[in-house]
Amino acid sequence: MSATESSSIFTLSHNSNLQDILAANAKWASQMNNIQPTLFPDHNAKGQSPHTLFIGCSDSRYNENCLGVLPGEVFTWKNVANICHSEDLTLKATLEFAIICLKVNKVIICGHTDCGGIKTCLTNQREALPKVNCSHLYKYLDDIDTMYHEESQNLIHLKTQREKSHYLSHCNVKRQFNRIIENPTVQTAVQNGELQVYGLLYNVEDGLLQTVSTYTKVTPK
């Protein structure tokens, strides 16, 4: 183990093997049992009843844990750049399962700053992807690249790449949020007062969430 690895704050590394993974899991399970002795036997073992569907990017730096939750509270779906195409079968099935079957009453679409998918398009590196055997990733990022070009006039006023990346991350949450709230399953649940939808942006620099958009039933005055 190198000096860098020995001083790392992380549990596992590229050099970790199966034994390391199982040992880390055993330690985690023991710690969870010490913190919440009833979590596994009395709650998780008897099924799930999550209150929230969390849709996010597959980036390793954040997940539903940013909500401060325990296993069993949040149903999760993540993909590269948290893209939600309206006709995507996985998206539609996930929304149906979470809302109709699991009865969640909150859907969160959560993007994040410093997104690799966004930066790839912002820095025009997407065009090189097919040359390094990433032709599927090239095609997949078409939605982000389209957004990048749609926002080109607004990006002109931002000075740094960091500012532009942050702005596009914010735009991407709005973009995917607007698709989610057009989903029939979502619309029905919201209009019945059974669901709220939140668009959030996670900042990788401080771990905090920022509200981007909300969709709830409008109550007549």
From Swiss-Prot:
Record text on cofactor binding: Binds 1 zinc ion per subunit.
Keywords: Cytoplasm, Lyase, Metal-binding, Mitochondrion, Nucleus, Zinc
Function: Catalyzes the reversible hydration of CO(2) to H(2)CO(3). The main role may be to provide inorganic carbon for the bicarbonate-dependent carboxylation reactions catalyzed by pyruvate carboxylase, acetyl-CoA carboxylase and carbamoyl-phosphate synthetase. Involved in protection against oxidative damage. Encodes a substrate for the non-classical protein export pathway for proteins that lack a cleavable signal sequence.
Entry protein name: Carbonic anhydrase
Catalysed conversion reaction: hydrogencarbonate + H(+) = CO2 + H2O
Taxonomic source organism: Saccharomyces cerevisiae (strain ATCC 204508 / S288c) (Baker's yeast)
Nucleus is among the record's keywords: yes
GO MF entry, a single one: carbonate dehydratase activity
Note: Present with 2330 molecules/cell in log phase SD medium.
